[in-house]
């Protein structure tokens, strides 16, 4: 038993230059663990609540000094002396201490920083890397990266309504090769955009953010880049979308403002299904809005046996909401974002529930990231087989990919790459 003897916290900056929380947990053995908390731009209405100061004189009101003080004060007092190896008890105590149903009292950012830092400390005490410490099956799976190479929506200041256009190197023989495939397509895409006189600046997640005549035009340009890089669309590399449709859904209507088009739920599902017929799209995230469960039913009936349908804003990594979705037979996959739910234990529970129901899980970053690499270890430890952590630029994104390269090297033939079998309905 390694007892917690100290917990430190500080206000740091994320990849958008906004404050976030970092925590360190120190054990009586001398082992230490540290974790930094990300932050989203397009957030689900039912996500756990991050605590911001609201003081307009500091960071435009986005400071997190209150959350930091909650770590240094009540959280430290409550956890000191507890066994860091008992993650479930640590997280249960944090939830009880907060007392709300959305972690809004202490702040999900304060709670998550300590929850993850505790796991890192316990892993260090066990003299294991985090992925090995968290793994329970003895099997390890390197994830297929879902690389967001064109950014739109809330992640970029451009004309594209939909948030992410991704490539999935499902045909690669290893994670290392998958990363190479993606990087080569990324650079080919930059050349395609430049040759057309389009902007090659990047958005929050490192993907390009050009102004295009339509959302569909982004797909065409990516397919051109895949072929230019020497790969076969649909074989070596497939496509994924994060529609983030809650961002443009109101009063029962989906509005693609850049195209001047409006759709009912059924019409928008038809629109996405037509793209699946036409292009090698194998995964669609948040194709329907989080509150349009009727639309999700239509969407799942239409595409749920053909491709992967991922719920992000729909499920917000919440085990209880996921169970409701499974009972309603909507979607067939869940996006896993640790800060949506706020503790490691609940995150792992969501992955377990999804797997038991035959749903896939995609471990994900947030648009406001840090150099922390915890999600890379979680993806490998839980064998989800998929990770979404941005494009092939910006060190806040590349840090996760580089961590996965190191994990792959450490595991050698003890691990395999997820490939086509990791994506729902693709194997």
Swiss-Prot record:
Compartment(s): Cytoplasm; Secreted; Cell surface
SUPFAM superfamilies, per database record: Enolase C-terminal domain-like, Enolase N-terminal domain-like
Entry cofactors: Mg(2+)
Reaction equation(s) it catalyzes: (2R)-2-phosphoglycerate = phosphoenolpyruvate + H2O
GO molecular function: magnesium ion binding; phosphopyruvate hydratase activity
Top-level taxon: Bacteria
Functional pathway: Carbohydrate degradation; glycolysis; pyruvate from D-glyceraldehyde 3-phosphate: step 4/5
A GO-annotated cellular component: cell surface
InterPro entries in UniProt: Enolase (IPR000941), Enolase-like_C_sf (IPR036849), Enolase-like_N (IPR029017), Enolase_C (IPR020810), Enolase_CS (IPR020809), Enolase_N (IPR020811)
A single GO BP: glycolytic process
Swiss-Prot/TrEMBL keywords: Cytoplasm, Glycolysis, Lyase, Magnesium, Metal-binding, Secreted
UniProt-annotated binding residues for (2R)-2-phosphoglycerate: 163, 337, 366-367, 388
Enzyme Commission number(s): 4.2.1.11
Catalytic residues of the enzyme: 205 (proton donor), 337 (proton acceptor)
Sites where the protein binds Mg(2+): 242, 285, 312
Entry's cofactor comment: Binds a second Mg(2+) ion via substrate during catalysis.
Record SMART domains: Enolase_C, Enolase_N
Xref: PANTHER family: ENOLASE (PTHR11902:SF1)
Family affiliation: Belongs to the enolase family.
Its job: Catalyzes the reversible conversion of 2-phosphoglycerate (2-PG) into phosphoenolpyruvate (PEP). It is essential for the degradation of carbohydrates via glycolysis.
HAMAP family linked: Enolase (MF_00318)
UniProt-recorded name of the protein: Enolase 2
